[in-house]
């Protein structure tokens, strides 16, 4: 029997609280339930492949929140982060990818699917698995892409703003694309 590589496996064992997926342990909010019920007549319709209305709405919402335009061309939607990670590596075809350890297995899965070489940046238990110099040192000029979760999955560590800015600037200088996964933010 193959072990599940993704969280949310409520079928093979009983789980009280599952922190491996970004589900709501309190259940569906009442407003979401009402919206779902209002849309029930459309359940048999195939969704808009371009996600046009969703893209327009989110672009507008983010633009208002940030006080500057967030173009709809900057947005990409999928059926979960794992699908998007696969799409990213297949579109970019990175030769070398850095993945902090521990991290979400979906990064490694995507990197292997694209035949990328993986360079693991092992985070230290002594620093509560917070990235630091060891991650910066792993991000050398031969690296094409960094997968980074903030907060980290599975540790839950949230990066400090100053460190994140330093890391992003370092990657910009090295020409490294950063895939910043904020699914749990």
Language-model features and meaning:
Residues 19, 178-179:
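Residue-level marker for buried hydrophobic side chains located in beta-strands
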């Amino acid at each position: 029997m193959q072990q599940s590589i993704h969280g949310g496996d409520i079928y093979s064992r009983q789980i009280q609280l599952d922190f491996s997926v970004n589900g709501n342990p309190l259940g569906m909010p009442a407003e979401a339930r009402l919206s779902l019920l209002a849309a029930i007549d459309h359940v048999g319709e195939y969704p808009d492949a371009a996600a046009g209305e969703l893209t327009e709405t989110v672009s507008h919402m983010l633009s208002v929140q940030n006080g500057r335009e967030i173009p709809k061309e900057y947005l990409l939607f999928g059926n979960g982060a794992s699908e998007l990670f696969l799409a990213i590596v297949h579109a970019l075809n990175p030769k070398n990818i850095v993945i902090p350890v521990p991290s979400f297995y979906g990064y490694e899965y995507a990197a292997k699917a694209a035949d990328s070489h993986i360079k693991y940046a092992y985070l230290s238990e002594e620093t509560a698995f917070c990235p630091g110099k060891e991650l910066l040192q792993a991000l050398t000029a031969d690296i094409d892409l960094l997968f980074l979760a903030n907060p980290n999955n599975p540790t839950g560590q949230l990066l400090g703003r100053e460190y994140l800015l330093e890391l992003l600037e370092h990657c910009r200088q090295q020409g490294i694309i950063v895939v910043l996964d904020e699914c749990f933010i």
